[in-house]
């Protein structure tokens, strides 16, 4: 089948069962296809000799119930008379000898790395939001303040959903916040942040590097112990992905992609301070977070197995309720140094959909796209 793509091949007069003393050529002959995607069918011809018909088995025979079943059907429909890069991919698949390997190869080809683009972006947003919260809750000594938070951390996201890759990540960056007390009730601020986040997909050589810039406008009102807060945030992340396919013969195909993700968020919170001690207070609160995220269409470059990924967007409507316990302690009676901390419990519920299903297409074969695995709801 190498170099050609037909669904049926005929090998004529392969065996002659009537040959006297012919060893394996004598009597009945057992025939088995080496390729898992072809069936070998022996047929006795008019001369009493054995012809072998090699018949293609559909790829989706091996993927029923799998998330990449639609992908398998798409490339099966384009098998006949394929040429160029498409033929190179089919030639590789035709040499696979067992079902586990054909399933693994089809799953790698389909592009599971791109199933959770938005999930990775939300991890970046979470790091920046935590840094902003720390600055906003630090005490202002004057009416105009500039605060800086140096960001360094790591995390891990584990996925139990088939076709969605788990990953570890490291983040470094900085966030600066300038606040101005316009009146004793109203504080206005703006912020600028940058992070570099490196994602490493588990059990693969796939990597995603993201450079993120965030701008923010912030308003806080305080009236009789009540606190009203609004944060309007805009972000853009510049992603560079490296994706690798490891074939059954240990050869690798490497692809690269560049794309941008854009996001907007509005954080709104109302809370009430209750002093329960000189340096301790309880803050029950309720909030509403609104968000929107989108990424553009993009294509990989590199090997024949390169993908094209469809644009996608997502939105968030997330109400929340909770309580925080905040405390501080001065280090010495004359010291200006303090230790501050807070602990809390809260509940939030996502009414939107921040993990809309992604779609991709194998550029050399698919005219359209196939659906990637659906990430689990938060």
Predicted regions, residues:
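Extracellular, surface-exposed repeat/solenoid domains
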Residues: 1-97
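Primarily extracellular Gram-negative trimeric autotransporter adhesin
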Residues: 49, 54-62, 115, 123, ...
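Conserved small-residue
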Residues: 52, 148, 219, 284, ...
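Outer membrane beta-barrel translocator domains of Type V secretion systems
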Residues: 90-277
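Short glycine-rich beta-strand segments
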Residues: 149-155, 193-197, 232-239, 285-297, ...
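Outer-membrane beta-barrel and related beta-rich outer-membrane complex signature
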Residues: 160, 202-204, 240-246, 294-302, ...
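Outer membrane beta-barrel transmembrane domains
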Residues: 220, 276, 292, 305-378
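Short helix/strand-bridging catalytic loops that position acidic/His residues to coordinate divalent metals
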Residues: 249-255, 302-310
């Amino acid at each position: 089948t190498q170099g050609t793509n037909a669904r049926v091949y005929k090998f004529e007069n392969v065996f002659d069962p009537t040959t006297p003393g012919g060893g394996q050529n004598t009597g009945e002959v057992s025939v088995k296809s080496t390729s898992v995607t072809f069936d070998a069918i022996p047929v006795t011809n008019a001369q009493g000799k054995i012809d072998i018909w090699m018949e293609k088995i559909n790829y989706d025979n091996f993927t029923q119930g799998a998330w990449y079943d639609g992908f398998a059907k798409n490339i099966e429909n384009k098998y006949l008379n394929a040429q160029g890069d498409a033929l190179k991919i089919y030639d590789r698949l035709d040499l696979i000898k067992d079902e586990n390997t054909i399933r693994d190869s089809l799953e790698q080809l389909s592009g599971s790395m791109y199933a959770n683009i938005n999930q990775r972006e939300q991890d970046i947003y979470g790091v920046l939001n935590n840094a902003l919260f720390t600055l906003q809750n630090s005490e202002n000594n004057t009416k105009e303040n500039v605060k800086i938070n140096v960001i360094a951390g790591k995390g891990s996201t584990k996925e139990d959903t088939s076709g969605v890759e788990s990953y570890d990540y490291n983040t470094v960056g900085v966030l600066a916040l300038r606040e101005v007390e316009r009146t004793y009730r109203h504080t206005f601020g703006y912020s600028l942040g940058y992070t570099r986040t490196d994602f490493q997909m588990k059990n693969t050589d796939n990597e995603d590097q993201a450079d993120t810039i965030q701008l923010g406008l912030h308003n806080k009102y305080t009236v009789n112990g009540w606190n009203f807060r609004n944060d309007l945030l805009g972000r853009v992340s510049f992603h560079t992905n490296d994706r690798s396919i490891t074939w059954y013969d240990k050869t690798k195909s490497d692809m690269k992609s560049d794309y941008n993700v854009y996001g907007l968020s509005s954080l709104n919170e109302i809370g009430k301070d209750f002093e329960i001690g000189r340096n301790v207070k309880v803050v029950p609160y309720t909030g509403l977070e609104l968000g929107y995220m989108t990424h553009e269409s993009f294509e990989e470059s590199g090997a024949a197995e390169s993908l094209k990924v469809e644009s996608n967007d997502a939105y968030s409507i997330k109400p929340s309720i909770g309580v925080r316990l905040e405390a501080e302690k001065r280090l010495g009676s004359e010291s200006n140094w303090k230790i501050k901390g807070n602990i809390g419990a809260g509940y939030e519920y996502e009414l939107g959909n921040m993990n809309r299903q992604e779609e991709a297409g194998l550029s050399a074969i698919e005219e359209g796209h196939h659906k990637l695995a659906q990430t689990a709801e938060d």
